[in-house]
Amino acid sequence: MKLESALGAHDVAITDVAAVLHTHCHIDHAGQDDRFPMTTPVVMNRRELEHSASGLMGGQYPPEYVKHHIDRLHAPGALRLLDLELSGPDEIFDGIVCEAAGGHTEGSMNILVETAAGTACICGDVIYDIQNQIVEPWHQALAFEPQTTGNHTMRKREEKAAMKRALNRDFVLPLHDFPARVEGGRVVARLKHEVPGPEFDVAEFAAEVATPVAAV
């Protein structure tokens, strides 16, 4: 879906966007920043910009993405860099807070949004698949022990800690799966396109949606 169409579905124009927040800057997450005017700040963790140019994850950071972000670095007001590992959580707008994620990439951040039903954690790719990593994690015997993926630059223990941190909120929203409601670190319900919104039984949802669909 084109950027204009995706925004238009919510009656939003490109020029209406106050800021663009990136959990991380991989190829499937940070494209089309160049479509936004330089007066619209792109917000990311400073460590993510550094990591994107390090070569550690190769083609997952396309050169045109990295070059555009460097261009923004030298345009006043076009890029906002956070230092979340040092500063702690940073409130970007009223009710929207960014925190260091601690997983997937060295500079990934969680975006915490206050809703009428509690805090929603947009966790990027710290979690890919709620059913197979959290609800019924592959090859894990310990209680509340998530399964990591193979796509990360952090140590496995850091990955597990990052997943547990993301689950320490009322809702968790991975960017390659549907959301979930969480209580005490355990997934208690699944949702689709609204948070908060209609909730579905975890087991029934898993049977209905065998293959996760990318969420916007």
Regions found by a protein language model. Name each.
Residues 1-2, 117-216:
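Cap/insert and terminal regions of metallo-dependent hydrolase folds
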Residues 1-12, 16-28, 46-100, 147-170, ...:
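Metallo-beta-lactamase
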Residues 15, 31, 38, 75-134:
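Catalytic core of the metallo-beta-lactamase
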Residues 19, 41-42, 171:
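Well-ordered beta-strand positions
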Residues 25, 48, 103-105, 124-126, ...:
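Active-site metal-binding loops of divalent metal-dependent hydrolases
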Residues 28-31, 51-53, 109, 130, ...:
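Short catalytic/ligand-binding loop motif for oxyanion handling, primarily in non-cytosolic enzymes
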Residues 34-39, 167:
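Short, conserved loop/helix-junction motifs that constitute active-site signature segments
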